[in-house]
A protein has these predicted regions:
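Two-component/phosphorelay signaling modules centered on CheY-like receiver
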Residues: 13-33
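Alpha4 helix (beta4-alpha4-beta5 surface) of REC/receiver domains from two-component response regulators
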Residues: 68, 89-106, 110
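Short amphipathic alpha-helix used as the core "switch/output" element in two-component signaling
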Residues: 67-78
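The feature encodes the CheY-like receiver
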Residues: 62
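Active-site residues of response regulator receiver
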Residues: 58-59
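Conserved acidic carboxylate
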Residues: 10
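Acidic, metal-coordinating helix/loop segments flanking the phosphotransfer/catalytic sites
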Residues: 34-54
């Protein structure tokens, strides 16, 4: 199965480490970097625009905003996915994220399994498209 490279922007160290562990254990996702702030995340994503397949972003960060990061991040190619993973998900947040081009939104408190499933499906899709 083809490996997908992810970057995680999450300010809670426990959640970040648990998320990384789950993704790397249960899917083909390999986390290539992470940060706790908007500026650090945006800097890495800009400097490595071709080196990630998905970015997973919390909306509320130590410094900065996940929404602003999503507004400012530029995809290096159309297949890159932007995923929001936050405790503050409701209909208006989902609508705003969709307007900003976010590919998927998951609630941390109830939808981590859905996030893992989404990543696993994306792994399978990319592998099938690559013909491996």
């Amino acid at each position: 199965m083809q490996e997908l490279k992810a970057y995680v922007v999450e300010d809670n160290a426990t959640i970040r480490e648990n998320l990384i562990g789950a993704l790397e254990e249960l899917t083909c996702v390999r986390v290539v970097g992470n940060s706790a702030t908007e500026d650090e995340g945006l800097q890495w994503l800009e400097q490595n625009s071709q080196d990630w397949d998905m970015v997973i972003v919390d909306l509320f960060l130590q410094r900065g905003s996940g929404i602003r990061l999503v507004q400012r991040v530029r995809r290096g190619n159309a297949s890159q996915k932007i995923i929001v993973f936050s405790n503050y998900v409701n209909a208006s947040v989902r609508k705003r994220c969709a307007q900003l081009g976010v590919d998927a939104v998951f609630d941390k408190s109830t939808e981590i399994d859905f996030l893992v499933d989404y990543c696993a499906r994306h792994c399978s899709q990319v592998t099938q498209e690559a013909g491996t």
